[in-house]
Amino acid sequence: MNTVIEPCCYSKQLTHNLELAEKGGGVSHFFSFSDWSTDELLPWFFGSVPGCEAVVSLVQIDFRTIYVLQHLMSRTYYDREAGETRPVVGRLTLITQPSRTDADAQRRELRAQLGKYIDEGRVVVCEDSVAFRCLAAGNGTRHLVLQGSINQSHMEPCTQMFTLTTSKGAWVQAMEMLRSKGKTKHIKL
């Protein structure tokens, strides 16, 4: 079943799509406007997979998104099985494609907001061409991959299809492909 995600109730509708994917073969498709609401999407996505290793691959990343990532890296949850507090996002690979004019400002902001986590080895920042937007997160129990076409904020708003996958196999494939960029396109901040 394909649905259209409305800005008014983003998290609620995404949770519904996640439930559909988990019940219906591991995949759910939905439509949304070309701009992702990252300040709502990222907390929902990573909160659905606590203790995850994750990849964020976006063409354009603004200061607000960097701030949201910093907030997520600082969040913790209580792991009942281990009996301890752990970070919601254990390790993050961030892949972006800044324009030449924005690259220096983006690097400074990434360093300012995420420098602590970069120094700890929990965040790896890469710059490379990005063919599609992708979020991937997995924690051994739950695995999510959200894919869509590239950011198109310079265009008129239009609906685009996105795919939410809950299979471990899809997560492994996405992580292998995107992790390789973490090794070859890593930048020092």
Which functions belong to the PLM regions below?
Residues 172-189:
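Cysteine/selenocysteine-centered motifs that mediate thiol-based redox chemistry or coordinate metal-sulfur cofactors
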Residues 40-119:
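Primarily the HKD phosphodiesterase
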Residues 69, 107-109, 158-162, 176-178:
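Surface-exposed beta-strand edges and their flanking turn/coil or helix-capping segments
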